[in-house]
From Swiss-Prot:
Residues 1-23 are annotated as: Disordered. All late proteins expressed from the major late promoter are produced by alternative splicing and alternative polyadenylation of the same gene giving rise to non-overlapping ORFs. A leader sequence is present in the N-terminus of all these mRNAs and is recognized by the viral shutoff protein to provide expression although conventional translation via ribosome scanning from the cap has been shut off in the host cell. This is Fiber protein. InterPro entries: Adeno_fibre, Adeno_fibre_knob, Adenobir_fibre_prot_rpt/shaft, Adenovirus_pIV-like_att, Attachment_protein_shaft_sf.
Length: 587
């Protein structure tokens, strides 16, 4: 049921798009109960949006002001009768032109117009077949898969890029885009581009043929190149051969020489094998001679000298005493010399060790007993307290015989003889004085080398040390490691010597074991270190260290004196100035 648009004239402007076609709702069709009008058709009609009947059309048909019309392009218009017409002012591009009679097409050869149709004039190999432009081909040009092709046979070929190429093999190749012939001597390409043979003497080219001029013994015959031979050269089975007689012989292709001793072949050279006494010198076989032999006018003789001479074909030895050569060479011996069978009959000294003699190393020495000593290489009498040498060098009672000994001083005397064995026997002189002052001992010490390495410091002698070891009563132990020898002077001071009173209790002179625990070499307070100078020279500093109870046994005591820093004074004598030290006593 249609409704008049006017009955809704009083509606507000927002309802101006009211659709008078059922279901009348212009705003929201999602809730419209779709009831399709019975007059819709898919031929030119459509329901869009739902519930609304509309025309279904496409360009050039459009609506304009609610009316169907057409989109008109350039050159098209509607006349007064509503008919489509073409205007005369159509814009065209070449080859078209707009004339009063209509559109005109301009063309040029090979295009033409025949029977009011545009056509194409052709000339072989082009043609038109079945209204198509075609190409007339003949081998080797072909048409394959609508493409021009080229049929090839070897050595021509086409590569993957469609390029025509030439298959080559040696000696042909391509150089600089030109076909090139590779040659090896003697073939060459001459300046004219022709292939020729390079020749060198004796080969040459004559009458366009290779020829070989020959000289004796070569010759050219109808059979070919040959050689003229004479004895001992022959030709056997087409090969040169050599006729030989002993000692020459040929084996296979080798000429050899048969040899027998003493001839040999060494390094492809014939040589003479020589035995003892013979040698080859230059090109001569000569006699080899050693020391004592010579040649005199081509005769080998004995060359003698130094007490030897020849007489009657014999060598004679002339000797003087103590030698004897009357039979075998021997040595005349005097008293005290014998041959020692146990040492391969070496000559040795025959001494009586019971009469005060002894061996010291390889030397005969005096075996000094008690009361005797050595000083500066001399045997001397050891004088005790109260004894002196008078003006006649006789032993006499000294004025100090009534001098009491000092129980507060232990010493070695102020200038003792060598009394220490450090590197070798009796090689040093130790001067030591210990004076007790209440609970303190003040000491003076010096050490002087008298022989061996201590007179000539070696690179291995970097430190010199002296050990004095005492037992639990403070008595000096004269065995190792004590450096003082058993016969050294040591005891209470009496005048300038040592008292005959034996030290039975020296604890008042011993380092305190509470202050210097034993052993204690690593504890700083158990050491006394001072700077001194080698030989008293202030340009030669060395270090002296005194260690207290450093190497002692369980119940004993010790004093150790060490001088270090000697490596800077190689080959110089070792001697130290007097140095003082102090320590706390045991009692």
């Amino acid at each position: 049921m249609k409704r008049s648009r006017t009955q809704y004239a009083e509606e507000t402007e927002e309802n101006d798009d009211f659709n008078p076609v059922y279901p009348f709702d212009p705003f929201d069709t999602s809730d419209v109960p779709f009831v399709t009008p019975p007059f819709t058709s898919s031929n030119g009609l459509q329901e869009k949006p739902p519930g609304v009947l509309a025309l279904n059309y496409k360009d050039p048909i459009v609506t304009e002001n609610g009316t169907l019309t057409l989109k008109l392009g350039d050159g098209i218009k509607l006349n007064a009768q509503g008919q489509l017409t073409a205007s005369n002012n159509i814009n065209v591009l070449e080859p078209l032109t707009n004339t009063s009679q209509g559109l005109k097409l301009s063309w040029s050869a090979p295009l033409a117009v025949k029977a009011s149709a545009l056509t194409l004039n052709t000339r072989a190999p082009l043609t038109t077949t079945d209204e198509s432009l075609a190409l007339i081909t003949a081998p080797p040009i072909t048409v394959e898969s609508s493409r021009l092709g080229l049929a090839t046979i070897a050595p021509l070929s086409l590569d993957g890029g469609g390029n025509l190429g030439l298959n080559l093999s040696a000696p042909l190749d391509v150089s600089n885009n030109n076909l090139h012939l590779t040659t090896e001597t003697p073939l060459v390409v001459n300046s004219s581009g022709a292939l020729s043979v390079a020749t060198a003497d004796p080969i040459s080219v004559r009458n366009n043929a290779l020829t070989l001029p020959t000289a004796d013994p070569l010759m050219v015959s109808s059979d070919g190149l040959g050689i003229s031979v004479t004895s001992p050269i022959t030709v056997i089975n087409g090969s040169l051969a050599l006729s030989t007689t002993a000692p020459l012989n040929s084996t296979g292709s080798t000429l050899s020489l048969s040899v027998a001793n003493p001839l040999t072949i060494s390094q492809d050279t014939l040589t003479v094998s020589t035995g003892n006494g013979l040698q080859v010198s230059g090109s001569q076989l000569v006699t080899r001679i050693g020391d004592g032999l010579t040649f005199d006018n081509g005769v080998m003789k004995v060359n003698v000298a130094g007490g030897m001479r020849t007489s009657g074909g014999r060598i004679i030895l002339d000797v003087n005493y103590p030698f004897d050569a009357s039979n075998n060479l021997s040595l005349r011996r005097g008293l005290g010399l014998i041959y020692n069978q146990s040492t391969n009959w070496n000559l040795t000294t025959d001494i009586s060790t019971e009469k005060g003699l002894m061996f010291s190393g390889n030397q005969i020495a005096l075996n000094a007993g008690q009361g005797l000593t050595f000083n500066n290489g001399q045997l001397r009498v050891k004088l005790g307290a109260g004894l002196i040498f008078d003006s006649n060098n006789n032993i006499a009672l000294g004025s100090s015989s009534n001098t009491p000994y000092d129980p507060l001083t232990l010493w070695t005397t102020p200038d003792p003889p060598p009394n220490c064995s450090l590197i070798q026997e009796l090689d040093a002189k130790l001067t030591l004085c210990l004076t007790k002052n209440g609970s303190i001992v003040n000491g003076i010490v010096s050490l002087v080398g008298v022989k061996g390495n201590l007179l000539n410091i070696q690179s291995t002698t970097t430190t010199v040390g002296v050990h004095l070891v005492f037992d639990e009563q403070g008595r000096l132990i004269t065995s190792t490691p004590t450096a003082l020898v058993p016969q050294a002077s040591w005891g209470y001071r009496q005048g300038q010597s040592v008292s005959t009173n034996t030290v039975t209790n020296g604890l008042g002179f011993m380092p305190n074991v509470s202050a210097y625990p034993r052993p204690n070499a690593s504890e700083a307070k158990s050491q006394m270190v001072s700077l001194t100078y080698l030989q008293g020279d202030t340009s030669k500093p060395i270090t002296m260290k005194v260690a207290f109870n450093g190497i002692t046994s369980l119940n004993g005591y010790s004093l150790t004196f060490m001088w270090s820093g000697l490596s800077n004074y190689i080959n110089q004598p070792f001697s130290t100035p007097s140095c003082s030290f102090s320590y706390i006593t045991q009692e």
